[in-house]
C-alpha cells in the first residue's frame, strides 16, 4: 500500500463516492471492507494513524463476553461468539484459541462458574472451541504453575480467542485496499458539506503532512469515530445531544514469567464489578482492565494511579508472585465508546450492543459495539448506508472473506507468524540485506526488517506508528522502545527522505508519548 498513490486517487476520483467513512479504527475499516467488497466506491479518512485510539488498546480478546451472561444479554453473547468463530476462520494467522482458567477458592464457585461457562460454550454452537470443564487443584497448577495456591480448591477451564488488535487492523486496512477502497491516514476531516436540501453530501479534509485540502462528495457519509462520534455529529449540529459515554480501561504489561503458561486467568468479578484477565501476549503477561467513567474522551488517555493500584492489588490476589510497580514494563489506557443508556447507573453495567444512528441531516453514525463484533457492526451499517444513499442493494460477503495474509501457515509460530503470507516478503528483505535481520532490542522480538516493511507496505509514517502499532514494542516494554527509537527514526528517515530536523521532531514526539507508558 502506498499513501501517495492513494492520495492521488482521492484527488482524481470521479465524484461522488458511494460512501465516505470518517474514522480508521476497527469499526471504520470494517465498514470499508464490507462496502468495498460489495462493489461500492469507498473513501476512508483517518486524522491520525489507523488504530491510534481505542482499537490498539483493547484487552486483545476475540470473545463473546462472559460478563454479559450475568447481565442476561444472551443475544449479544451469541452474536459475539459467532463473530469470534468468523475471526478465527478468516484471520487464523492473527487470532488464536487459548485456554482460560477460572480459579475457585470457595466451595460454590466450581458448580456456579462451571454451569455458566458450559452455557457460554453451548451458545457458540458450531462456532464453539474447546470443551469447558471443572479442574482439580492439581490440574489447575499444571495449567498455571504460577497461580496462588493458598486456599485454592479447584478451577474451571474454558476456551476463547486472543489476537493482536493493531496487527489485525492493519491487515484489515490491506483487505479493504485489495477490495478497491482508498484509505488514508493523517487526513483530517475539517468540515461536512450539505446539499441545498440540507443533507450531508461530502467532506472537506486536510492532508496533515502537506496541508493540502480536498473537497470530496459522497452519496453517504459515515461517522465511525468511536469515542469521538459526538464531535463529528456536532460538525452538523453544534447542539447535538451526547450519545457516547466514554469509559477508561487500563492494562499493565508484566514479564511472561508471571504466568509462565500458554493459559490465561479470568477473574469473574472484581471490586468494581468487572472481569479481570491475566493473559499471555507476545511472551509477556497482560493484566486488565478497569472501568473508569470519563467526562470527555481524549486521544492519548493516561492511566490513573488508583487504576494502577487496583490492577496490581487484584492480580496479587491470584498470582504466586505479587506484582509491584517495579515489575510493570508498560501501562496503557483505552477508552470504551459506550452508547448512553439512561437506565444504567454505571459504565460497567452498560451493554456493548452497537447502534446505527441517522441524524436528520443524513449523517450515519455507527457507535458502541466491541472489537469482536466489528464485522457485524459494519454489515448493519452498510445495509443502512445503501438504503440512505439509494445505492444498488448488494449482499454482504464478509462472513467468508479472508483477511489479508491469511494464506500463511497459522501453525508456524515464528516472530513473523502474525504477518501471515507477508512473512515471506519480509524474509526476502532480510536475504537482500542481512543487517535487516538484526533484532532492534534483545528484550523485544522485532527486527529491523519490520520497520522497513511497515513504512513501505503498511502506511507507517512516524516512529510512533512503527513502535506502537505496526510492532507492539511500546505496549510490551516502554523503556526498551525509547532505547531503540533513534534507530527506528533513522530507518524511517531513510525510507521517507526526512531531513534531520524532521527526524528529530518525530523522535522527540515519540519520547514525550512514551513517558505516559512508564511508571518509573
PLM region descriptions:
Residues 60-143, 276, 411-412:
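Dinucleotide-binding Rossmann-like beta1-alpha1 core, especially the glycine-rich loop
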Residues 36-57:
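Glycine-rich FAD pyrophosphate-binding loop
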Residues 21-22, 216-226:
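Short hydrophobic core segments
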Residues 185-201:
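A conserved short coil-to-beta-strand element within the FAD-binding core of flavoproteins
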Residues 28-29:
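N-terminal Rossmann-fold NAD(P) dinucleotide-binding loop
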Residues 1-19, 34-38:
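Extreme N-terminal leader/targeting segments of oxidoreductases
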Residues 14-17, 210-220:
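Core beta-strand elements of the Rossmann-like FAD/NAD(P) dinucleotide-binding domain
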Residues 16, 20, 48, 94, ...:
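C-terminal accessory subdomains/tails of enzymes that are appended
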Amino acid at each position: 500500500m502506498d499513501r501517495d498513490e492513494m492520495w492521488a486517487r482521492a484527488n482524481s476520483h470521479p465524484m461522488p463516492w458511494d460512501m465516505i467513512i470518517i474514522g480508521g479504527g476497527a469499526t471504520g475499516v470494517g465498514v470499508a471492507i464490507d462496502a468495498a467488497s460489495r462493489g461500492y466506491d469507498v473513501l476512508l479518512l483517518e486524522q491520525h494513524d489507523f488504530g491510534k485510539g481505542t482499537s490498539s488498546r483493547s484487552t486483545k480478546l476475540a470473545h463473546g463476553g462472559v460478563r454479559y451472561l450475568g447481565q442476561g444479554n444472551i443475544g449479544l453473547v451469541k452474536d459475539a461468539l459467532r463473530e469470534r468463530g468468523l475471526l478465527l476462520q478468516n484471520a487464523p494467522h492473527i487470532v488464536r484459541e487459548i485456554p482460560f482458567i477460572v480459579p475457585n477458592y470457595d466451595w460454590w464457585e466450581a458448580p456456579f462458574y462451571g454451569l455458566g461457562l458450559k452455557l457460554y460454550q453451548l451458545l457458540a454452537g458450531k462456532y464453539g472451541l474447546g470443551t469447558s470443564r471443572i479442574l482439580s487443584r492439581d490440574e489447575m497448577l499444571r495449567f498455571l504453575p504460577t497461580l496462588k495456591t493458598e486456599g485454592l480448591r479447584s478451577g474451571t477451564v474454558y476456551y476463547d480467542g486472543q489476537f493482536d488488535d493493531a496487527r489485525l487492523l492493519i491487515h484489515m486496512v490491506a483487505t479493504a485496499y485489495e477490495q478497491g477502497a482508498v484509505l488514508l491516514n493523517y487526513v483530517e476531516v475539517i468540515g461536512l458539506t450539505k446539499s441545498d436540501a440540507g443533507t450531508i453530501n461530502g467532506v472537506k479534509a486536510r492532508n496533515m503532512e502537506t496541508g493540502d485540502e480536498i473537497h470530496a462528495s459522497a452519496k453517504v457519509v459515515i461517522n465511525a469515530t468511536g469515542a469521538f462520534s459526538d464531535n463529528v455529529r456536532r460538525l452538523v449540529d453544534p447542539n447535538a445531544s451526547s450519545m457516547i459515554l466514554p469509559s477508561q480501561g487500563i492494562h499493565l504489561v508484566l514479564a511472561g514469567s508471571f504466568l509462565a503458561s500458554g493459559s490465561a486467568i479470568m477473574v469473574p468479578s472484581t471490586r468494581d464489578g468487572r472481569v479481570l484477565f491475566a493473559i499471555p501476549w507476545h511472551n509477556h503477561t497482560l493484566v486488565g482492565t478497569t472501568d473508569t467513567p470519563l467526562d470527555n474522551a481524549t486521544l492519548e488517555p493516561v492511566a490513573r494511579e488508583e487504576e494502577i493500584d487496583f490492577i496490581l492489588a487484584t492480580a496479587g490476589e491470584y498470582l504466586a508472585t505479587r506484582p509491584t510497580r517495579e515489575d510493570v514494563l508498560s501501562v496503557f489506557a483505552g477508552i470504551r465508546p459506550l452508547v448512553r443508556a439512561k437506565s444504567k447507573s454505571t459504565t460497567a453495567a452498560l451493554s456493548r450492543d452497537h447502534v446505527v444512528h441517522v441524524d436528520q441531516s443524513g449523517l450515519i453514525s455507527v457507535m458502541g459495539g466491541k472489537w469482536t463484533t466489528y464485522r457485524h457492526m459494519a454489515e448493519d451499517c452498510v445495509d443502512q448506508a445503501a438504503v440512505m444513499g439509494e445505492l444498488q442493494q448488494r449482499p454482504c460477503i464478509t462472513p467468508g472473506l479472508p483477511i489479508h495474509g491469511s494464506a500463511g501457515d497459522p501453525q508456524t509460530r515464528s516472530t513473523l507468524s502474525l504477518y501471515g503470507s507477508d512473512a515471506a516478503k519480509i524474509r526476502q528483505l532480510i536475504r537482500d540485506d542481512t543487517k535487516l535481520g538484526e533484532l532492534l532490542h534483545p528484550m523485544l522480538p522485532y527486527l529491523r526488517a519490520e520497520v522497513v516493511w511497515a513504512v513501505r507496505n503498511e502506511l507507517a509514517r512516524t516512529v510512533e506508528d512503527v513502535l506502537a502499532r505496526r510492532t507492539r514494542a511500546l505496549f510490551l516494554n516502554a523503556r526498551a522502545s525509547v532505547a531503540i527509537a533513534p534507530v527506528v527514526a533513522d530507518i524511517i528517515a531513510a525510507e521517507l527522505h526526512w531531513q534531520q530536523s524532521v527526524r528529530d521532531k518525530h523522535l522527540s514526539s515519540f519520547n514525550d508519548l512514551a513517558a505516559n507508558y512508564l511508571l518509573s
